[in-house]
């Protein structure tokens, strides 16, 4: 079974996000395949590295996707 987890965070909330990711990885080592994503709404490169370091420590994959790239890839908006 493949498990997918998605977070949305900014620099203002990245410490809590990192704590949650650490707990997720530490308490779910029995799950072999876990895809974890963070949608960044302004996370600094320094803090992105810290999040990636957590994933590396647990040998997990963590994808960080910038919000702007999602908006460019998909057309979001109101109206028809």
Q: Language model features by range: what are they?
A:
Residues 40-80:
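Active-site-proximal specificity loops/subdomain of glycosyltransferases
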Residues 28-37:
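Short loop->beta transition adjacent to catalytic acidic/histidine clusters or analogous donor-positioning motifs
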Residues 9, 13, 36, 40-41:
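Short secondary-structure transition/capping motifs
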Residues 25-29, 55-56:
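N-terminal cationic-hydrophobic initiation segments that often serve targeting/anchoring roles
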Residues 3, 34, 60-62:
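A structural micro-motif
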Residues 1-26:
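N-proximal low-complexity "stem/linker" segments adjacent to membrane-targeting elements
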């Amino acid at each position: 079974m493949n498990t997918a987890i998605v977070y949305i965070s900014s620099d203002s909330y990245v410490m809590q996000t990192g704590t949650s990711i650490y707990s997720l990885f530490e308490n779910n080592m029995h799950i072999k395949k876990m895809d974890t994503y963070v949608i960044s709404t302004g996370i600094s490169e320094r803090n992105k590295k810290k999040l990636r370091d957590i994933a590396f420590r647990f040998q997990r994959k963590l994808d960080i996707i910038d919000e702007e790239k999602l908006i460019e890839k998909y057309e979001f908006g109101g109206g028809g």
